[in-house]
Amino acid sequence: ANRPVYIPPPRPPHPRL
């Protein structure tokens, strides 16, 4: 049985100032 792996939502790329 495989354990459900929590996948965090993709974060938007932060603008590099």
Curated annotation (Swiss-Prot):
Keywords: Antibiotic, Antimicrobial, Immunity, Innate immunity, Secreted. Belongs to the apidaecin family. Induction: By bacterial infection. The keyword Transferase does not apply. GO terms for cellular component: extracellular space. It is found in: Secreted. One of its GO terms (biological process) is innate immune response. Pfam families: Apidaecin (PF00807). Antimicrobial peptide active against many Gram-negative enterobacterial and plant-associated bacterial species. Not active against other bacterial species like H.pylori, P.mirabilis, B.pertussis or N.gonorrhoeae. It comes from the Eukaryota. InterPro entries: Apidaecin (IPR004828). This is Apidaecin +A.
